């Protein structure tokens, strides 16, 4: 069982792509906004984002240990936040140059490592391609 991370700026299309991809791999879904809401933790400072990455990692690992594939979508704006999340396959959704929130735009560092680079908001056509390529890694 593997964990697929779909990351990028807010509004880039991460959730839409995750919603298309998850059923293809019969995966459990983790959405960062839903996890934050359940934890009632709206701290978007660097420390808050690390805490969120650890929280997402804990949920993802638990689901993986239960025998599930996991598709998680969240911003994961810094290398440190990404290092805290145990992704087996990374999809970078790079469809916009600036997101909705200035603090996130300032904090966001483009990833050095990723397995699939999405540059257009075309989830219905891209999800099958990502699925096929992820089979090599999954």
Question: What is each PLM-predicted segment?
Answer:
Residues 6:
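Hydrophobic anchor at the beta1->P-loop junction of P-loop NTPases
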Residues 14:
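Conserved lysine of the Walker
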Residues 18-58:
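Conserved substrate/cofactor phosphate-moiety recognition/catalytic segment
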Residues 47-98:
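Glycine-rich phosphate-binding loop used to anchor ATP phosphates in small-molecule kinases
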Residues 72, 115-124:
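Phosphate-binding beta-loop-alpha motif at adenosine-nucleotide cofactor sites
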Residues 136-138:
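Conserved small/polar residues in nucleotide/adenosyl-binding loops
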